[in-house]
Amino acid sequence: MNDAAERKLVLSNLWVAFLAFVVACFLGEYQVLERSGFIPALESPTVYFASVSTHGVLMAFVLTTFFIMGFGYYIATTSLKVPVWNIKLAWCGFWVSLLGTVMAAVPLLTGNASVLYTFYLPIQAHVSFYIGATLLVVGSWVWCLIMLVMFGQWKQANPGQPVPLAMFATTANALLWLWTSVGVALEVLFQAIPLALGWIDTVDPGLARTLFAWTLHPIVYFWLIPAYTAFYVFVPKQAGGFLFSDEIARAAFIVLAVFGLPIGFHHLYMDPEQASGWKLLHGVGTFVVSLPTLVTGFTVIASLEIAGRLRGGKGLFGWIGSLPWSNSMVLSVILALLMLILGGFGGVVNASYAMNAMIHNTAWVPGHFHLIFAGTTVIMYFAIAYYIWPLLVKKPLFSNSMALIQLWTWFIGMSILTTPWHVLGLLGQPRRISSVVYNTLLTLAWKPYELAMIFGGLILLGSACLFIYNLAKTQLNPATEEFTQQIEYAEPIHPVKALPEYLNGFKLWNRVIAVLMAISFGVPILQFFFMETFGSPAWGY
């Protein structure tokens, strides 16, 4: 990427993402302090739930959406070696998303949208929150369109050639996001906004939760696919080796996109509006989608072993010590995989019908998704930033040693934060509470774990500040010499000359997704329009 305008587009998206991230980190530390009860002066349910809602929206929607858009533009231009298709439209999408973010932030920060990032109805937020969230998503749809167009144009210009793996993964993510965002869009447009404007008096919460379930689990893969992309296209090269298999990587992204969509009812296991058969179907699908994660773990570790042995590693495990641990990308993937293993185990518990009943609505649940998202996913966002930031600003990274310290402290802080969070869930602490106003032997047993969480949160906050400082210094430092480093994508150990169309495109898989979505969500949604709901029609009018 040599065009200054395109680099500016990428950097603008990434800066919005990371500034939202660091604000959310400060809010997160306040929350563990407030909930612990150690500082009574901080206790305020109003401020707490405004903080939790803002923290969740900034992390789950703003950080991820802007990062994925910026990273996607970078991948598209550097892997396809073409400029962004319609850069004016790309900027339009950016400004629409930014406008939506600001619109949603005002009611969040003023306590008029304390509905958490899931905003389950019939709890209401100010209408500007819903309109802002809608604009954020609409701006991201512009990005999806640009990715799909660039993918199609490249295939048309290079018939029979394998699409670069990085672009294949990015396009899979754009396709997944277009499908999965439809659920929340329907909820907001036909239920939340009309209710907030007073156009309707009531809504069916069961339909609202079903529509949000359409989005709630696949959005995790929308967040995760950029991390997996780095696993496959950056890590092997940075480690000094080769990608174990290009074809396996493509299959993993296809399974994530296809089978990651028609699931989500494990979030509704305790809800009465869906029958147990549909929950079982979605539960089975949830276990199916764990397969690409297992495949990814195998492929990435195999690629690392190739690199370690090429660097002189001997014996069964000697290759591990031969890896370049001082490389931020390599260190990040090792730490990310460790957190993914533990977080994946928690995900299996959540997806299991019986075990889910034990931990449903307990502190276990936020412990789990912080380990998967803020752990595995975000640490790879750091790694990607450390790798591409010098390429974007044409200056060397300010401090590689600071980057390594930041990655280790993020891993340590996340471990200290989420381990007691899981334990508190097993001890029965409910989630979504601002404080504990009663003292029993059980609640007193929670105190040591809450103290540990405060300590872990402080480490994470310091780590986040180090990250932002390193990027800012990299960009603001004067250039002392010409920067010539170029992006390097990993090559497979067996070069790919040609691929079957089902591993090089999405026409077939888009049709499969349509069929699976109709099976998984058709009857569960349509039932609300045909069954008696006792005065609460599906859309509310």
Q: Over which residues does each language-model region extend?
A:
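Intrinsically disordered, low-complexity regulatory regions of eukaryotic signaling and scaffold proteins
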Residues: T65, A275-W278
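Generic start-of-chain signal for non-secretory N-termini
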Residues: M1-S12
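Fe-S ferredoxin-like electron-transfer domains
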Residues: P122-Q124, S128
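Membrane-interfacial, low-structure loops and terminal tails that flank and connect transmembrane helices
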Residues: M1, Q156-Q161, A307-W325, P478-F506
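Hydrophobic cores of alpha-helical transmembrane segments in multi-pass integral membrane proteins
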Residues: V10-A41, T46-V82, I87-S114, S128-F151, ...
